[in-house]
Structure formats: C-alpha cells, structure tokens
UniProtKB/Swiss-Prot annotation:
Locations listed in the record: Cytoplasm
SUPFAM superfamilies: EPT/RTPC-like
Pfam families per UniProt: EPSP_synthase
Recorded metabolic or biological pathway in which this protein acts: Metabolic intermediate biosynthesis; chorismate biosynthesis; chorismate from D-erythrose 4-phosphate and phosphoenolpyruvate: step 6/7
Role: Catalyzes the transfer of the enolpyruvyl moiety of phosphoenolpyruvate (PEP) to the 5-hydroxyl of shikimate-3-phosphate (S3P) to produce enolpyruvyl shikimate-3-phosphate and inorganic phosphate.
EC number assigned by the record: 2.5.1.19
Any one GO MF annotation of this record: 3-phosphoshikimate 1-carboxyvinyltransferase activity
Keyword Amino-acid biosynthesis found: yes
Sequence positions that bind 3-phosphoshikimate: K23, S24, R28, S170, S171, Q172, S198, D314, N337, K341
Similarity section: Belongs to the EPSP synthase family.
Protein name (record): 3-phosphoshikimate 1-carboxyvinyltransferase
Catalytic reaction equation(s): 3-phosphoshikimate + phosphoenolpyruvate = 5-O-(1-carboxyvinyl)-3-phosphoshikimate + phosphate
Keyword terms, alphabetized: Amino-acid biosynthesis, Aromatic amino acid biosynthesis, Cytoplasm, Transferase
Length: 428
C-alpha cells in the first residue's frame, strides 16, 4: 500500500461484512492456549501485526503452534504451566499493548531472564501500575531506559499475595494479573484502587478464563481472589468472534449513508463491550436490528449525543467522526485513556477534526464536536494509529474526497479494512 490513500466520495453503503476475528480475544486466547494443558484449535483467528508479535514471542519462549495458509486458524500446543526460557532473551512487542502487558505479568513467574521491548510509542506508554502491583508479589522487574515505561527486564520471582492496582489507566493491567495469578505459588488477592476503566474488557478476560477452566471470584470488580496452583485446560476448539470495534466503522457508515449494512460475527451473544456502539447509533437516530451473530444498521436522521464512552474507548473514536454527520453538538466524556493509546488520541482527533471544519473543545478527558455546515476536504495525518485511519475513512461518505496518510497502519488490527469498505461502497 502506498504512503497515502485517496478516498473518493462514496454515494451509498450497502451489503454484508464478515468481520475479522477480534484482536482482543485473539491475543488473550493465544496466551491462555500456551499456558494450558493440551492442544487448542483457534478458528476465525485474526492475522495482524499485533497477533504476530504475540506469536513470535510465544515461539521464542518454546511454545509450538501452526497457522493455516490463510491465517484464520491457529493450533497451539500448550506447555501446561508458566512460560520459561533457559537462556536470557529479548522479545519485541512492537506497539502491541496486549503483548507487552500480558507478557510482563506472565513472565514474572518462574526464574527466566527476559527483556521486553517495543516500538517508539510503546516506550512512552505507562507500565508502572502493573509493575508496582507485580513487585508487591516479589516480582523482580527493572526499567532499562525511562522510569515507568518499557523496555523492562524481568527475572521472575512473583509468588502471589495481596496486591493493589490502580485501575484508572488501562484494564490491560488487571487482565495481565488475572491471567498469571492462577499459576502463582500463593493465592492472590487484587484490590482495584480508583475507577476501573474499560470494564467490559475485564469481563471478557474472566469469561475466557472460565472457558480454559480457571475460577476467579470478585466483588463488584473492586476485589479479585484467585486460588494458586490452578491449571489452564484446553477447550480443544475455540471460535473467536468477530471484532466489535471493527464493526463500528461499517455500522456507522450505514447510519450515515445506507443502505443497509449487516456485520456478521458479533451479535446478541457477543462478549465484547464495543457491540454497545450499535446502541449509541440507535440513540443518535439510526435503526438497529440484532441477531444472534449479526447486527444490522439502516440510516436515520442523526442527532448529536452526550455519552460517557469509558467502557468502549476505541469505538468512541468512531463516534467522534460520526458526529460530523449529525445535527447538534456531540460530547464524548470520560476518555482520558485516549491520551495513553497508540498516540495521544484526544489531541490527535481534535487536530484532524478541526482540519475538516469542525468546532472542537478539548478537555483533559472529553471532547465536544460541532459539525460545520460544509465539511472541508483534508489530508488526514494518522499518527501511525490504526483507529484514526479507520475512523476518518468515514469522511468519504461526505461529498468531498479525503486523503489518508500512512493507511498501512490499519495492519495492526485490520489489514484488509479498506478493501471491505470499498466492497460495501460498490467500488470493487
């Protein structure tokens, strides 16, 4: 793919999309399968940059797996316990937060000597809530460059015990502790301090741990108790549901300029919080129909909305660009953790929305958007952030073209996104 992509105005969106596998689920079940006893066959697996970093790390740690030629099926042979390596190694996690954070916890078990590093942005992202919690359980962790951020040196040592974790930065930290704690020497109790962000992702983690035979008790998502010496057990086969955040772009496109779009792979039984974005569109005026494994959207007269989007911060970016096609202001609240993602998303989204003529008020944890009477053609800087690229592709639904810089950044989670968008628009 070239350094930029010109999207011509799209007249209408219509059709059916089969969603790629969820990135969040794919990387969780990859790790759970590696820790489990037995072989696990993962279908509708997501082949993307983030899952490849997880696979490469697992391979370096001695985990055996095979991936089908089309990349959608992965078979993992579990090691039936903690991941260890007899020699010091360095693992690259790219900009995959799930890989960096989950492995930081899991590799704090045992006595391995591992360095975890990442890309430039990963080296700026916070790790201290997780590292502080792991150190309470005797984990031996050293910051190698900048305090509180990767790269990290891990020398095992985690035993369990009573841990406190700040919950206001990322739910990935809690997920990391939950996944590793069943393999600890002692029972583990985790107390979440402050507000727990992105709680649906923790619910997803607990669901998947149950699938792999692990029991966790909790009280209102404030305290978690995990028994030691548990064993992960392979379910044999696990089908990964479609990516709900990916669905948000196509559902929003239908709300703006349908037609009718049906996304297949998520529905009433989805374990992902981002499926609730369909409810947000309905509140704005779109028409939504739910099936067991699909969601349909038809257009309506969209109105601005005031929403707390803490439970689905990724889909909140889709809301920000959808707001440009609605009447009245839109306010997206409680999204401070946008600032800690692949880029400072609050600043980046504000800057790019202003290019299009929108009136923007940016706060520490919110953004207010007022659409202009006439959108302006613009060149969108993506900041190497896949979600910015995909969110701003919706601007092609206006009457003017849009240029997306570095469109390849979508390979992080959705390599063929633009092909699927073109299919729905009838341009392929």
């Amino acid at each position: 793919m070239s350094k930029s992509l010109n999207l011509e105005p799209i007249g209408k969106i219509n059709g059916t999309v089969y969603l790629p596998g969820s990135k969040s689920i794919s990387n969780r079940v990859l790790l759970l399968s590696a820790l489990a006893a037995g072989k696990t066959r993962l279908t509708n697996f997501l082949d993307s940059d983030d899952t490849r970093y997880m696979l490469e790390a697992l391979k370096a740690l001695g985990v055996r797996y095979t991936v089908s030629k089309n990349g959608t099926c992965c078979e993992v042979e579990g090691v039936n316990g903690p991941l260890n390596t007899p020699h010091p190694i360095e693992l690259m996690t790219g900009n995959a937060g799930t890989v960096m954070r989950f492995l930081t916890a899991v590799l704090s078990l045992g006595q391995s000597d591992v360095v975890l590093t990442g890309g430039a942005r990963m080296k700026e992202r916070p790790m201290d809530p997780l590292v502080d919690a792991l150190r309470q359980g005797n984990a031996q962790i050293t910051y190698l460059e900048k305090k509180n951020s990767p790269p990290l040196r891990l020398r095992g040592g985690f035993r369990g015990g009573n841990l406190t974790l700040r919950g206001n930065i990322s739910s990935q930290f809690l997920t990391a502790l939950l996944i590793m704690a069943p393999l600890a020497e002692q029972d583990t109790a985790i107390e979440v301090q402050g507000f727990l962000v992105s709680k649906p992702y923790v619910e997803m983690t607990l669901h998947l741990m149950r699938v792999f035979g692990i029991s966790v008790t909790h009280k209102h998502y404030r305290t978690f108790n995990i028994k030691a010496h548990q064993k992960f057990k392979s379910p044999g086969h696990y089908r990964i549901e479609g990516d709900a955040t990916a669905a948000s772009y196509f559902l929003a496109a239908a709300a703006i300029k349908g037609g009718c779009v049906r996304v297949i792979g998520v529905g009433q039984k989805s374990i992902q919080g981002d499926v609730q974005f369909a409810d947000v569109l309905q509140k704005m005026g779109a028409f939504i129909h739910w099936g067991e494994d699909y969601i349909e959207c038809r257009p309506g007269r969209l109105k601005g909305i005031d929403m707390d989007m803490n439970s689905m911060p990724d889909a909140a970016m889709t809301l920000a660009t959808t707001a440009l096609f609605s009447e009245g202001p839109t306010r997206i609240q409680n999204i401070y953790n946008w600032r800690l993602k692949e880029t400072d998303r609050l600043s980046a989204m504000s800057a790019e929305l202003r290019k299009l003529g929108a009136q923007i008020k940016e706060g520490q944890d919110y953004i207010e958007i007022i659409s202009p009477k006439n959108l302006k053609a613009a060149e969108i800087q993506t900041y190497n952030d896949h979600r910015i690229a995909m969110s701003f592709s919706l601007m092609a639904l206006s009457d003017m073209p849009i240029r997306i810089l570095n469109p390849r950044c979508t390979s992080k989670t959705f390599p063929d996104f633009f092909q699927k968008l073109a299919y729905l628009s009838g341009t392929v």
